[in-house]
């Protein structure tokens, strides 16, 4: 029987930024993409989400809600490269791994359209025949979870 692990990292883009810039971890920040001259939120960290901001929101609306919001440019290509490296790192668990990124796009409509998956990413690991090497599926998942959050 085929067994596949799907890891969804909903805040991959902002978590990656928070690791690179620790001073931002507890402050609300958003990553912005521009489309047709209109900046919009591509990804928001948990502090910004608690303040009511969501991916897809127009930057002007986000600033009206949270004037102190820290804005950074979105780097989806960099996120994709790091996610691919992370998929390679998952080779410790199985020879069959792949990254699956969710790329959001700033919509043309205003003022707010949710971008499901924007700034997030995921990993698929074919664990068929591999879990026993880690003490079973549960132990394997615990190991993956603890290591990936470091």
Stretches found by the model and what they are:
Residues 1-131, 136-146:
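Residues that scaffold, gate, or flank divalent-cation-dependent active/transport sites
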């Amino acid at each position: 029987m085929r067994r596949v692990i799907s890891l969804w990292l909903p805040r991959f883009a902002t978590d990656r930024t928070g690791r690179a810039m620790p001073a931002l971890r507890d402050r609300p920040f958003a990553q912005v993409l521009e489309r047709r001259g209109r900046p919009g939120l591509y990804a928001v960290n948990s502090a910004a989400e608690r303040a009511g901001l969501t991916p897809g929101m127009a930057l002007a609306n986000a600033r009206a809600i949270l004037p102190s919001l820290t804005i950074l440019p979105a780097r989806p290509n960099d996120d994709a490269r790091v996610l691919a490296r992370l998929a390679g790192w998952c080779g410790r668990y199985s020879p069959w791994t792949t990254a699956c990124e969710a790329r959001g796009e700033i919509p043309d409509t205003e003022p707010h359209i949710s971008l499901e998956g924007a700034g997030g990413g995921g990993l698929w690991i074919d664990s068929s025949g591999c879990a026993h090497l880690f003490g079973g599926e549960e132990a394997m998942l615990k190991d993956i979870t603890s290591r990936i959050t470091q």
